[in-house]
Amino acid sequence: MIYRIISHIPKIFFKPAYDLYERYLIEKVKSGVLPKHVAIIMDGNRRWARKHEKPPWYGHLFGSKKLEEILEWCHELGIRILTVYAFSTENFKRSKEEVDRLMKLFEEKFRELVTDKRVHEYGVRVNVIGRKELLPKSVRDAVEEAERATRKYNNYILNVALAYGGRSEIVDAVKDIARDVISGKLRIEEIDEELLRRYLYVPNMPDPDIVIRTGGEVRISNFLLYQIAYSELFFVDVYFPEFRKIDFLRIIREFQKRERRFGR
């Protein structure tokens, strides 16, 4: 609430102090242990659009621009892996108009990634995780093109969860394991937590150190259920298009102050 009141004050009045505080936070964050993997539930696009008396697709468009900013922040700080929750399997239940608009936006953005100079300059590999078969063919083609164009890169990794559900990911992994047991490729005695990890959508990806949810809701919404068992969770009362670099830095700074016990 306080943030939303402050956000209406002309920025010119506090920009010098804001910039100074941002530089201070960057210095502090860079001097500490940085997370290797950050995951974000990008919530609040539609409510942000509603606040501005715009249709839902308008909020998703501005959300995609915010994601581009966050990729720059990660590059600046040296955070190698970013996973974002873009569209869940449950989101298909939204209105046809909104889903169609979103699919068109996804197609456009994945095609833009192929020619984005920053992607190739920074060496960003793009992975799309989820049940891709549920996506329209035009989106699947754009996804495959982006993945193919960036497959050789390994400096930074962007995982986009699309037509994704955490439970579905676990179910799909279990089915693949069962097939390998039946075919004789795998013995039941070999199955453990680490083996199951190898059957997830992105095998052997380090677990997220941090999970951020914007939009003010305090829930996980079926996101990376297997991978976030020991992640540090942060819930921010800011719509995703309004999520600021200073918010991101504060979260990382708080993460650096926490003692991670990993269930011990």
From Swiss-Prot:
Positions bound to substrate: 44-48, 60, 88-90, 92, 94, 213, 219-221
Cofactor note: Binds 2 magnesium ions per subunit.
Enzyme class: transferase
Residues given in the record as Mg(2+) binding sites: 43, 232
Protein family: Belongs to the UPP synthase family.
PANTHER family: DEHYDRODOLICHYL DIPHOSPHATE SYNTHASE COMPLEX SUBUNIT DHDDS, DEHYDRODOLICHYL DIPHOSPHATE SYNTHASE FAMILY MEMBER
Name this polypeptide is given: Tritrans,polycis-undecaprenyl-diphosphate synthase (geranylgeranyl-diphosphate specific)
Lineage of origin: Archaea, Methanobacteriati, Methanobacteriota, Thermococci, Thermococcales
